[in-house]
Design a protein with these regions (language model features):
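Flexible beta-alpha connector loops of hexameric P-loop NTPases
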Residues: 5-6, 26-35, 71, 76-77, ...
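Loop/turn-to-beta-strand initiation segments
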Residues: 25, 46-50, 66-69, 92-97, ...
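Conserved motor-coupling elements within RecA-like helicase/translocase cores
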Residues: 30-51, 58-67, 203-220
Length: 377
């Protein structure tokens, strides 16, 4: 399951030729496919079948007879209940793999708590170079520097992404909007192919634009966060994130990852809104911007995000905010919890588990009341 049709189609096109060699049927299920009922009928097949899709996989009429493996890509884009729906859509509990470039705070907390085991790919693919991150203010001087970077990359026959938080101008005109920025870039680069992409466009129009970007028929693409996942343009070497203080840390990291996918040197500019500098940004916004330019490491960023946002309800569905833990604080107890998990995984037996629970009940008679948030007086 992937969060966007573009990404689901990309996975289908990659996996279908491989699985065909083993006589495994592969089906793509999204909201726009025409043979939906036929695909759903295949879910009761007794033969090995591979389904790739979007949220269409978790609709009410979708039921798997024998789901053995559930893979969720870009899992930070799905809510807790949505991930649960996929896993519970079969009469057996499937094996699960969740994939993300930046685990959200709740994921970090759950991984520490033992619900998830983590495998880390901490190396760049062969031939790729580290992306350089640059933080620029909204001053006129820095605005001109952004254009200088554009000229430099265009001279190298590279492509550029410019991402804005909104489609239209808001009441605060200093926050960059995609349509306004598109008009500006048309004037600044009249001899270049500048295009606009956003979520209000029809699917066919979006697909056409991305196809042209893929074929290097577009030089500069002005967009909203619709390109956050599933875009693989190897010739794109400059990402400009306008009004960067308006984005979450997770989004900033995902957007940065849209460049640096080829062998050319790539850069990502985090450009603050007009007339703003880092000192005028909110404390939380400042922490996010300083964090994103300090590292390209997704796991380090997730730990920083954990400190900024909190881990959310360990037993509920909130993925950020105050914890429901009464003693531990995963923002500060991360290392000791990590060591505890390693120890318990090695040493825990049913007898030891019973003994620990018994001791805890004696030492903390009001333990269950604490956990339920009841009055323990």
């Amino acid at each position: 399951m992937a969060p966007t049709e573009v990404l689901a189609e990309q996975h289908y096109n990659s996996l279908n030729p491989i699985l065909e060699k083993y006589n495994i049927k592969t089906y793509l299920l999204t909201s726009s496919v025409k043979d939906r009922s036929e695909i759903i009928n295949q879910m009761s097949s007794s033969k090995p079948v591979f389904f790739i899709g979007t949220h269409a996989l978790i609709q009410k009429d979708v039921n798997f007879t024998n789901l053995g493996l559930a893979i969720i890509d870009e899992q930070q884009r799905f809510g807790v209940d949505q991930r649960k729906k996929l896993i519970e859509s079969s009469n057996i509990i499937p094996h699960q793999i969740v994939m993300t470039a930046t685990p959200i705070p709740r994921t970090t907390a759950l991984a520490v708590y033992g619900d998830l085991d983590i495998s880390v790919i901490d190396e760049l693919p062969p031939g790729r170079k580290e992306i350089e991150s640059i933080l620029l203010s909204g001053s006129q001087r820095d605005n001109n520097i952004v254009i200088d970077y554009c000229n430099e990359h265009l001279k190298n026959n590279s492509q550029i992404f410019v991402v804005c938080p909104y489609i239209d101008e808001s009441e605060n005109k200093d926050i960059k909007a995609a349509e306004k920025v598109y008009e500006q870039y048309l004037k600044l680069f009249p001899d270049k192919k500048v295009r606009l992409l956003h979520g209000r466009m029809k699917s066919e129009e979006k697909e056409s634009i991305m196809s042209k970007m893929n074929k290097a028929e577009i030089d500069i693409l002005i967009s909203t966060v619709v390109i956050e996942v599933g875009i693989d343009i190897q010739n794109a070497t400059l990402m400009i994130i306008e009004s960067a203080e308006r984005f979450g840390l997770n989004q900033l990291h995902q957007l940065r990852g849209r460049v640096g996918r080829g062998s050319k040197k790539s850069q990502c500019i985090f450009h603050i809104s007009n007339k703003l500098n880092i000192d005028k940004v909110t404390d939380v916004g400042k922490q996010r911007l300083n964090a994103i330019v300090s590292t390209n490491d997704g796991f380090k960023l997730s730990e920083l995000d954990l400190k900024i946002r909190g881990e959310g309800k360990v037993t509920g569905t909130n993925q950020s905010g105050l914890s429901d833990l009464k003693i531990a604080d995963l923002r500060y107890d991360f290392d000791i919890l990590k060591l505890s998990k390693i120890f318990i995984n090695k040493e825990l037996t049913p007898e030891l588990e019973e003994k620990i629970y018994g001791e805890a009940t004696l030492l903390f008679p009001n333990f269950m009341k604490f956990m339920k948030g009841e009055d323990a007086s």
